[in-house]
């Protein structure tokens, strides 16, 4: 695997083999994700071609709008921020239909291009779509490739000694997030300035490319209110009221945040249609640093002092869990579970029809009652063997059994104390 250069550090993206495989199979590979996740750097590492165009360049953008076919003549070619010129995708389609060969086009975009109907229709049967998440902590630090410890939880022969242990520092990673430029900034005050600039760029450029928004201040207020509800069930009526927006406008703005790869609505898990379950999704952000900045969290002390610190720990660990899912989206899914009596499990990992239930705790102490939600989930499942195991991820350092079926495992390796600095 080639290494890629991000600012002053060499970083190997776990995602790279998946992009390379896609390019061996299909004529078009579409790589999406939030701005500043490293899509361009990854694309150039996968396909070191001289034919590279970015539609952030006004000259290239004008060429794409006036003569899109001219950008498809030299192949293989990388075209960045392709959502800025949807007609260009039609030219790509024509080029593929004239001479179909694998790996001809690598397109990137800061928008989920599947939601743009004209693009999705044009590339049907010609493209593989991949979504690059921001870095998770262990990927940034170059540790434990491909999140093997999470995969091992699905195996019957998993042993406690395999689970990594180490000092954790979730507020550190909550504030850092996973955008490479932000991760390179060593102090919180400078990082806060960067996050503010990021939001302005998103509002003034990326958002307007996706849809007309009549009031950017209204949209930013909605972002702040949504960030303050990180990890919670989405009550759209309450969110609309607090943001002083209509429900239809709130729904549309949430759709735009999701289409822009900024936020996601985590869907609830159900295995038994007769059980009374909550069907409302939960809100999580693709980048925990952005979410915490929007919510007004400016320091590690402020994060740990919050009454809702548990939700922010969940958001921090979600950074790793979404990476786990993104590495194999066809066979992996991420859910949560909650019934109408309030029993819940924070995250459910699904892999090829089998499940691992995870409960998240900030505490350094854990006891069997902390797994009560996992036990309740197990009781509702028709196929109880499908739930391979449950685990309470907690702030201590000792992996151990809580019961015959459930484990207590430290989350420290997923948000480690970073001895390497920035």
Residue ranges and their predicted role:
Residues 395-422:
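Domain-level recognition of nuclease-like catalytic cores that cleave nucleotide substrates
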Residues 39-40:
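Conserved lysine of the Walker
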Residues 3, 183-355:
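Accessory nucleic acid-recognition modules appended to NTPase machines
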Residues 90-113, 120-122:
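Conserved catalytic/switch belt of AAA+ P-loop NTPases
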Residues 2, 112, 118-228, 232:
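Interdomain motor-coupling "hinge/lid" segment immediately C-terminal to the ATP-binding subdomain
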Residues 28-31:
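Hydrophobic anchor at the beta1->P-loop junction of P-loop NTPases
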Residues 1-20:
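N-terminal pre-Walker A segment at the start of P-loop NTPase domains
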């Amino acid at each position: 695997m080639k290494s890629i250069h991000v600012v002053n550090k060499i970083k190997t993206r776990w995602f790279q083999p998946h992009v390379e495989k896609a390019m061996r199979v299909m004529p078009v590979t579409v790589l999406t994700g939030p701005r500043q996740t490293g899509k361009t750097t990854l694309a150039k590492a996968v396909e070191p071609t001289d034919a590279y165009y970015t539609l952030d360049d006004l000259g290239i953008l004008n060429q794409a709008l006036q003569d899109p076919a001219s950008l498809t003549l030299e192949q293989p070619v990388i075209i960045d921020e392709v959502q800025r010129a949807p007609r260009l995708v039609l030219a790509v389609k024509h080029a593929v239909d004239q001479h179909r060969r694998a790996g001809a086009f690598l397109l990137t975009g800061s928008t989920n291009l599947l939601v743009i109907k004209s693009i999705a229709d044009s590339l049907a049967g010609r493209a593989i779509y991949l979504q690059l998440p921001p870095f998770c902590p262990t990927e940034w630090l170059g540790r434990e490739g491909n999140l093997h410890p999470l995969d091992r939880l699905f195996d019957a022969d998993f042993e406690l000694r395999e689970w990594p242990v180490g000092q954790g520092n979730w507020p550190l990673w909550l504030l850092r997030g996973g955008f490479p430029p932000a991760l390179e900034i060593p102090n919180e005050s400078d990082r806060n300035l960067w996050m503010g600039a990021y939001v302005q760029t998103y509002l003034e450029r990326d958002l307007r490319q996706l849809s007309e928004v009549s009031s950017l201040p209204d949209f930013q207020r909605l972002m702040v209110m949504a960030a303050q509800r990180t990890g919670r069930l989405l009550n759209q009526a309450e969110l609309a009221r607090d943001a002083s927006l209509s429900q239809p406008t709130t729904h549309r703005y949430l759709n735009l945040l999701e289409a822009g790869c900024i936020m996601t609505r985590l869907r609830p898990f159900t295995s038994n249609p007769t059980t009374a379950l909550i069907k409302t999704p939960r809100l999580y952000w693709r980048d925990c640093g952005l979410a915490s900045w929007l919510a007004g969290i400016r320091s590690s002390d402020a994060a740990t002092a919050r009454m809702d610190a548990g939700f922010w720990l969940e958001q921090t660990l979600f950074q790793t869990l979404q990476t786990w899912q993104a590495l194999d989206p066809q066979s992996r899914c991420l859910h949560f579970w909650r019934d109408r009596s309030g029993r819940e499990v924070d995250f459910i990992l699904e892999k090829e029809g089998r499940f691992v239930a995870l409960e998240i705790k900030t505490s350094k102490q854990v006891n069997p009652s902390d797994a009560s939600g996992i036990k309740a989930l197990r009781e509702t499942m028709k196929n109880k063997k499908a739930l391979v195991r449950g685990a309470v991820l907690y702030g201590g350092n000792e992996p151990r059994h809580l019961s015959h079926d459930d484990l207590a495992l430290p989350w420290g390796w997923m948000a480690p104390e970073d001895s390497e600095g920035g």
